Amino acid sequence: MKIGYFVTACNEINELTRLLLMLKTNVSKSDCIGILLDEDNHTTEVKELCEKFLLPDNSIRMAYAPLNNDFATFKNVGYELLEDCDWIFQIDADELPSSTLMDNLHSILEMNPNVELILVPRINTVEGLTRQHIDKWRWKVNDEGWVNWPDYQGRIYKRSADIQWVGRVHEKIEGHKQVSMLPMHEQLALHHPKTIERQEQQNEYYETL
């Protein structure tokens, strides 16, 4: 079984650096990393960063595609980029998977042979978040400061022609027959830290779509 860790990115240089270093350290030798950059919206700095991580054996690879405000079509490029993989774990550039999940992912998949999609809990934190923001966006924030926990994300999916991303915005996986959810444990969650400035920028962008 081969898992492809599929990173989608634009110009998030600091976040992408952090993610790629983490993945390179923790990805199993039997797996690979695929990086997809928005060909119309990435900086030279981001391109050069990604190129530094590429390996001759293709275990870390990169491609370009236009986002064109269509997130599902963009993410479906991963099926070609990771054509030699059995499973895909899609991760946004500003997220971090847990090393515990990565260490145990092969075992989890092997113990659930009929599952085609796994929902992953996500810990969202926003530095600078105020009560005014929370009320405005109608968010739920727990005592740890996690926004909308467990905020399950469909990110680990079988590479199959029947299973595709759909939806230009707030895209999701469809075509799967059986889905499973990871437990709501911090050790298994995606981590998604942001600043309030970044959150406001993204909200403004989504409002234009």
Predicted features by range, described:
Residues 10, 38, 122:
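Histidine-centered beta-alpha loop that forms part of the nucleotide-sugar donor binding/catalytic region
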Residues 71-79, 87, 96-209:
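Catalytic-site signature of metal-activated, phosphate-bearing donor transferases
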Residues 3, 31, 86, 94, ...:
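Conserved acidic residues
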Residues 21-64:
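Acidic donor-binding segment of Leloir-type glycosyltransferases
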Residues 1-25:
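N-proximal low-complexity "stem/linker" segments adjacent to membrane-targeting elements
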Residues 64-71:
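Short, acidic/glycine-rich phosphate-metal binding loop used to engage nucleotide
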Residues 18-22, 48-49, 77, 103-107:
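A short acidic, amphipathic alpha-helical/loop segment
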